[in-house]
Amino acid sequence: MVKSVLAGLLAAVILIFGSIIGADLALRSTMQVDLIGTAAHAISLTQPVNKDEIVTNPFDESYEMKDVQDEINNSVANMITYSEENGYWVNFTPSSAGMKSMISLSDKQVGALASTVIKQEAAGQVQIRDLYMDIEIYQVEFEKNEEGNAIVNSVIGINTTSFKSIIPDAFPLANIKNIIPDILYISSTNEVIKGEESFEYNVEHVDFTINNLSKEQTESFFYTLDTLMGVGSAEYINVQIGTTLMHALVGNGANKGLAYSLKEYGAKDFNFVQHGSDIYFEVQR
């Protein structure tokens, strides 16, 4: 009796293992998808993340926003207000005669401002395809400055609830769905390239990692999910995050942002400018 039960269990294990291997081989040959590797990456995502190793340039939003308020309001009166009930609020159509001076913000101040604007204008979310995912910004850092362009790194926490809701409850993705954490730590690095016209910018992919995965592992993980579900590649998601950040800082006709909203108040353009060892985001007049 015991032998027959053990034999049955062994047969079941062999069947499941064989199914995974079979599916992996089929997907490798038809779609170049590494299902076993993706499952291993998903398991790695469950490991503890040392946030201090990822967030190397943290900011205190309340502390930094006080300085942001002073800097911006000294140029454009009452553009940023504060109340106990609503916190900081950016008025993109202030009752002001115009800009009195250039606005200059450090990377930490940019992080605080971007966080405030994204909460205010985008419900604290980033759009990935048809999904809207809650985010929290932990870091913004300017890594390089060339001819007004910059390499901009942001570290965010992203809530995966809406993403996991669209993963099928069927083999082979069901097991991956069940072990993806509710919060992923994303390090997003893009190059912001100024356009030929004032206030124009393009965001180009540089580097993108999640939790403890390397760049290559992150790309492989999202390649599988994109191939099977159409969620977007690592490069696409990275650019979406970088673009959301730049919409808050600069903006355009469709997206409210600091620099573009001040065009009618005397703003000429935005720029990334280096002073000593520090790089600043500036709204010029």
Where in the sequence are the language-model features?
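Extracellular/lumenal and peripheral-membrane lipid-interaction modules
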Residues: 1-285
